[in-house]
Amino acid sequence: MVLLTMIARVADGLPLAASMQEDEQSGRDLQQYQSQAKQLFRKLNEQSPTRCTLEAGAMTFHYIIEQGVCYLVLCEAAFPKKLAFAYLEDLHSEFDEQHGKKVPTVSRPYSFIEFDTFIQKTKKLYIDSRARRNLGSINTELQDVQRIMVANIEEVLQRGEALSALDSKANNLSSLSKKYRQDAKYLNMRSTYAKLAAVAVFFIMLIVYVRFWWL
């Protein structure tokens, strides 16, 4: 289930639009998650990963960044990641068309609160079970969600560093992993060459032995 949707400007974390599931409908207090979302917005910058999943216990945040705007959704952890990102892509397409040019000029929080109407309509589409089955088949062109960075929301917020730093560490780990694989391949090649050289030396010595002692 989609429980919370927020849109914010990356440059300063200013909330532009939001839609929250009513507490009595969801049976959960979403204020804590809304607070975490606002903290996250303040940590984003131009170097932050443009696609990210943040685990929050039984819930999961997903976000995308497009044209300097962050589109974030809070879902139950069991909600399919592919659908969550397809939902965010739909919001981006409509929001950018309606308000994209105005985003850099606004200074008041929730200047586009009327966008909630479209959010609610789109959310119902993704929650409906039959629609979800259809969406699951038509969104095959969505980027590989398995490659999207995954982190823990509490660790990101408590670490006190920008999300870009976390992304940098992930890239460093990827580089180290690649270097390790290259080094391992090089060592395997050296080992193979050493074995071949040993075999060659054996046969040369055998030929020399036969030639000088038996001929």
Curated annotation (Swiss-Prot):
The keyword Transport applies. It is a single-pass type IV membrane protein. Residues 6-119 form the Longin domain. The modification N6-acetyllysine is found at K38. GO terms for biological process: endoplasmic reticulum to Golgi vesicle-mediated transport; negative regulation of autophagosome assembly; positive regulation of protein catabolic process; protein transport; retrograde vesicle-mediated transport, Golgi to endoplasmic reticulum; vesicle-mediated transport. Its main location: endoplasmic reticulum. One of its GO terms (cellular component) is synaptic vesicle. Belongs to the synaptobrevin family. Interacts with STX17. Component of two distinct SNARE complexes consisting of STX5, GOSR2/BOS1, BET1 and SEC22B or STX18, USE1L, BNIP1/SEC20L and SEC22B. YKT6 can probably replace SEC22B as subunit of either complex. Interacts with the COPII Sec23/24 complex composed of SEC23A and SEC24A; recruits SEC22B into COPII-coated vesicles to allow its transport from the endoplasmic reticulum to the Golgi. Interacts with BET1. SNARE involved in targeting and fusion of ER-derived transport vesicles with the Golgi complex as well as Golgi-derived retrograde transport vesicles with the ER. This is Vesicle-trafficking protein SEC22b.
